[in-house]
């Protein structure tokens, strides 16, 4: 169903939409790592959670995900209405050694050092 405040992101650059969004509803996509840097609320809508874990598996323990895990639409709506949030700081501390906004500089310096040594 169409709704003026819901964007179908199938053909959109998700990173451009991050700045416009207030929260993210995702499955266990790796997009949560990118979005977590923004310190915004996330919800995980996984109606097929048990099948997904059995068939595909998850690289990260789902208990570490920084948001409410919702197995049905009612849980998702309730989580949003109650503003149920996860421990975003703990998640970032586990997965990001550096959180100072200087990662690009570090990568450029690393590449420069590698190139300098190879000449």
What are these regions (language model features)?
Residues 1-33, 38:
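Donor nucleotide-activated moiety binding/catalytic core segment of transferases
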Residues 1-2, 70, 103-105:
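Conserved catalytic-core segment of nucleotide-activated headgroup transferases in glycan assembly
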Residues 14, 73-74, 104:
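Residues at or immediately preceding the N-termini of alpha-helices
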Residues 30-96:
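Catalytic binding pocket for nucleotide-activated donors in carbohydrate/polymer assembly enzymes
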């Amino acid at each position: 169903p169409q709704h003026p405040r819901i964007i179908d992101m199938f053909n959109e650059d998700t990173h451009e939409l991050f700045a416009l969004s207030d929260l993210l509803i995702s499955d266990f996509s790796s997009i949560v790592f990118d979005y977590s840097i923004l310190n915004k609320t996330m919800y995980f809508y996984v109606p097929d959670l048990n099948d997904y874990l059995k068939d595909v598996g998850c690289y990260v323990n789902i208990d570490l995900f920084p948001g409410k895990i919702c197995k049905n639409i009612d849980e998702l709506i309730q989580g949003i209405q109650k503003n149920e949030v996860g421990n975003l700081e703990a998640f970032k501390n586990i997965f990001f050694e550096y959180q100072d906004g200087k990662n690009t500089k570090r990568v450029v310096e690393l590449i420069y050092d590698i190139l300098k040594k190879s000449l």
